[in-house]
Amino acid sequence: MKRTLAIGDIHGGFRALKQVLERANVTENDKLIFLGDYVDGWSESSEIIQFLIRLSEKQECIFIKGNHDAWTEDWLSFRNASDVWLFNGGQSTVDSYSDYSQEDLEIHLEFFERMKNYHVGEENRLFIHAGYSSMHGPEKEVYFSNYRWDRTLWETAVAMDKKLSKNSELYPKRLLLYKEIFIGHTPTLHLGIKEPINKANVWNLDTGAAFTGALTIMDVDTKEFWQSDPLPALYPNEKGRNNIM
């Protein structure tokens, strides 16, 4: 049976990615939707991109672009590394590309350029890295950076009264547009939780792989999920992005 599986923020943790694909028994029949932030953090960002390029050649994959991916795309395009990016995990990505040829760098750049801002799948499910602010949906978003940086969508879902009916005038209009919304970007660790969180119709799959958490993959139909080992256990001699926690 073909499954649709969503994967949270990876942040250079290639070992974690391999673990969750194995633990979920992923086959070439499964559709994989990656929610972005493949890079910046642990030491294997370029290895992840190379793996994903090859993976997409043999099975259906959808790659959403995260804010860290946009930073890396800019660096691959212009070789201009901002201090903010380097501090937030970019240095590990730069280091991982140290032995790449210009031809291979261009292949990876093309991969970043092909990433999607968002994807609407079967049964009206939205997959987006961060969120959107327009009550008319992401296609009407004025500030495209919100696809990768917004936190208000998640904060709205978290703060909502659970008793609020969808028929209420107070129910957030932008949440009514989709059956379900799958996001990453804001680690569930911020709420002291190491597993995916569901608030209203929003599912947050960023379980803190950049920091002390694990990487998560979820079957979007059944909501069954699998996690890697905590990333510090997989990279015991590295800090990931824990320098900014």
Named regions from a protein language model:
Residues M1-F51:
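N-terminal active-site segment of His-dependent metallophosphoesterases
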Residues R3-H11, R125-G131, W203-L205:
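Active-site-proximal beta-strand elements of phosphoester/diester hydrolases
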Residues A6, L32-F34, F63-I64, L126, ...:
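Residue-level marker for buried hydrophobic side chains located in beta-strands
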Residues G41-E123, R148-A159:
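Active-site neighborhood of divalent metal-dependent phosphoester bond hydrolases
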